């Protein structure tokens, strides 16, 4: 019983904190739009990242909290399919836009002699198309997911062997379940690898740039962190948060797919891991962008 209340508190806290953080960042960009300020090309990616995070939080955190409070059968089969589908789409777009953000950042900071330099002028023109393509791919990849989910009260049409908290997953074919888990995890693993490679390239570029600047003029060094250092720190924080949260989330999802009847602890822990990055990423963006931080905490003045 105690573990149940702990799970309720953690899921509810994650949901509330994540939603507030997402709204704060969105309001910041809305203020830019209303005042006519010119946005960077990557700001469009950030806005879609925040929307995807909000969708993932709303469709996972709220129903999971209600289920942890003991509310039963509040979603029918169609509701379960829709909520799970929207969560998967939001989760996928969150991963994809984070990967896109890393790619466009490394193109931005690359030197003229870098292998990324050829894309420097073309990349800003394709930001909107890249984000739209990310949404379309996530919608198509996850369209099979609702086929295996139903309401907890509807056990007549499929064999239920997975308790997913507020809904149930069906099917008793282990091979099919394993293939489904691998298919759904493949885009995540692909984005993980791509973002690690791109981010490591960016860190190397910034490190070489810092060494050249120090070599040219050591007398102008300031004790404050340089923009390159702040960019490097933001990359490392975002990549570390992304890799750790989604690696654990994928592992828990694979375990749930392979087990016949996962217990409530595994279900709640999987829910916590799945909304970990959507909860933390707005605050990572705040810490990396001084203008966002000043806007979101202006009430303290």
From Swiss-Prot:
Give the InterPro entries listed for this entry.
GPCR_Rhodpsn_7TM, Vmron_rcpt_1
Has the keyword Disulfide bond been applied to this entry? no
Topological relation to the membrane, as annotated:
Multi-pass membrane protein
Q: Which UniProt keywords apply?
A: Cell membrane, G-protein coupled receptor, Glycoprotein, Membrane, Pheromone response, Receptor, Transducer, Transmembrane, Transmembrane helix
Assign the protein's first listed, main location to one coarse class: membrane
Q: Where in the cell is it found?
A: Cell membrane
Recorded GO cellular component terms are: plasma membrane
This entry's Gene Ontology molecular function terms read: pheromone receptor activity
Which ranges make up the Cytoplasmic topological domains here? 27-48, 110-126, 207-234, 286-301
Query: Is Nucleotide-binding found in the keyword set?
Result: no
One Gene Ontology BP term is: response to pheromone
Residues carrying covalently attached carbohydrate according to the record: 154, 157
Protein origin, superkingdom: Eukaryota
Task: Give ranges for the Extracellular compartment.
Answer: 1-5, 70-88, 148-185, 256-264
The job of this chain, per UniProt, is described as:
Putative pheromone receptor.
Name the PANTHER family on file: VOMERONASAL TYPE-1 RECEPTOR
Comment field (misc): The chimpanzee and gorilla orthologous proteins do not exist, their genes are pseudogenes.
Family statement: Belongs to the G-protein coupled receptor 1 family.
Protein name per its UniProtKB record: Vomeronasal type-1 receptor 4
Tell me the gene name. Answer: VN1R4
């Amino acid at each position: 019983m105690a573990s149940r209340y702990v799970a309720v508190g953690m899921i509810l806290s994650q949901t509330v904190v994540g939603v507030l953080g997402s709204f704060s960042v969105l309001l910041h960009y809305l203020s830019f739009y209303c005042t006519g300020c010119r946005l960077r090309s990557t700001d469009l990616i950030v806005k879609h990242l925040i929307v995807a995070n909000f969708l993932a939080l709303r469709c996972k955190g709220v129903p999971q909290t209600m289920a942890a409070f003991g509310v039963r059968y509040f979603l029918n089969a169609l509701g379960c399919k829709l909520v799970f589908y929207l969560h998967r789409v939001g989760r996928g777009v969150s991963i994809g836009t984070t990967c896109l953000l890393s790619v466009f950042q490394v193109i931005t900071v690359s030197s003229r002699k870098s292998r990324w330099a050829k894309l420097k002028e073309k990349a800003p023109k394709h930001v909107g198309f890249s984000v739209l393509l990310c949404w379309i791919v996530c919608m198509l990849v996850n369209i099979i997911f609702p086929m295996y989910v139903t309401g907890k009260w509807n056990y007549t049409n499929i064999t239920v062997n997975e308790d997913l908290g507020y809904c149930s997953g069906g099917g008793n074919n282990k091979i099919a379940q394993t293939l489904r888990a691998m298919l759904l995890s493949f885009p995540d693993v692909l984005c993980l690898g791509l973002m690690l490679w791109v981010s490591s390239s960016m860190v190397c570029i910034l490190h070489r740039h810092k060494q050249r600047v120090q070599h040219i003029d050591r007398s102008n060094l300031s004790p404050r962190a340089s923009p390159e250092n702040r960019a490097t720190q933001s990359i490392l924080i975002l990549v570390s948060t992304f890799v750790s949260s989604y690696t654990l989330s994928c592992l828990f999802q694979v375990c749930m797919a392979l087990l016949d009847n996962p217990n409530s602890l595994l279900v709640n822990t999987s829910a916590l891991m799945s909304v970990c990055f959507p909860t933390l990423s707005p605050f990572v963006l705040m810490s990396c962008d001084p203008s966002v931080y000043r806007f979101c905490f202006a009430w303290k003045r």
